[in-house]
Amino acid sequence: MLSEAELDRFGRTIWPDLVGRPATALNQAKFGLSRVLPVFNRLARDNFQVLEVGAGSMLLSAYLASKGLNVTALEPLTPDFSWFEPLQMEVLAYCAREGVRFERVDSLAEEYITPGRYDVIFTIHVLEHMKDPLRALENMYRSLKQPGFLLAVCPNYDVPFEPHLGIFLVGRSKSLNARLYAHRIAAKSKVWDGLFFIRYSRLRQYLNEKRIRYAFNRSMVRDMFQQLEKDQFFYARMPRFVRWSHRILKSAGVIDLLYFVPLRMQTPMELLVTK
């Protein structure tokens, strides 16, 4: 049975001294599993095909494969995320020793398509790092079986806040914001250069144009703020503004009311596509 507790033990087996980037990778994997587990539970069978788009350290893909799922991990390791490479090597070395097998694909999501192959495709905080996320989503949709599910979590830039750098955006122009926040951006220039300001309003328009069945999760932001109370490492990873907002909302006792925030004003956003 899949669980965050089991994933935690799996990660600590690979990285007994869980500090620094391994700790971040494990926390990211646990968050990803928490979002995709409800999708897995909607499938009647156990032996299904899974694609993780933007697998990063590959820890989550490796864990799912260790539990018997047929997993493909898509990760091109672009320059802004080259720090994942040593973590990948450690995960893959462990898998080789333990006989954990899954398929690895070094490809951009915009260039990868395997029609009708996967029961579940998920991508967690990756779309905003793609040059053409809508094309990537189309490829993912075409790669789904019928029935099949596609889960995507990413920031919603209809809300003028950039979480990777913790800055409030002025308008939609990257060049304008690059000038306004030159000093802040300099420290994470590779991440900034690779960002695409994907927006709920544009994503919804695109899905309607393509006549794709979808639903945005109104509970996403509420769930995230509730998780901040339970997971101190997750809390520490958040931008200062998010931590500050959490303290205010918690002291006012209104975190549950985040469910009623209009979808266009929720960030991050969670999209579930059904085929």
Segment roles from a protein language model:
Residues 1-116, 120, 264-273:
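Conserved N-terminal segment of class I S-adenosyl-L-methionine
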Residues 57-60, 77-79, 127, 157-159, ...:
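Short, solvent-exposed loop/turn segments at secondary-structure junctions
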Residues 62-65, 137-141:
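A structural alpha-helix within SAM-dependent methyltransferase catalytic domains
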Residues 88, 134-139, 149-274:
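S-adenosyl-L-methionine-dependent methyltransferase catalytic module, highlighting the catalytic core
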Residues 120-126:
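A short beta-strand submotif of the Rossmann-like class I SAM-dependent methyltransferase core
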Residues 130-131, 144-146:
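Helix-to-beta-strand junctions that scaffold the AdoMet/dcAdoMet cofactor pocket
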